[in-house]
Amino acid sequence: MILHCNYEELGALKQGANVLLGHGRGEGFSIAAPPEGRTEVEALLPRLGGDLTIETLAEQRWVARAIQAIVESLKEEMDLFIITAHPADESAVASYFQYGHALSVLARVTEMGQEMEALIEVVTGAPPSPEVAKTFLFPG
């Protein structure tokens, strides 16, 4: 399955990943990522050059966890810019749009996961087990 992302969404995800990993604009403050979320974001970052091909439910789940961590990072960054500057400050407004774009991708990848789970259940007659989540392939 393909998760389509536009230019703004990819930019927001990259920015959020860099903030979460301690690079870029957010270097001046700390946003704590759990080690699992950090590892998943590091693995996702090189794939953020275009649409994402997701072949298994297990892959969708780790991509969703990485994007969730990015969204949380962008939300914290947005809150910080609003509190330290002003809601109408340029950095606060820009961070709002970054957060919104990433949140839109999170909603789509979550919906994709629900559709994948439903399709697996229809085909196999049972909810997806961890093994099936890793081995049931979806076309790209």
Where are the regions a protein language model picked out?
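Positively charged, low-complexity terminal tracts
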Residues: 1-140
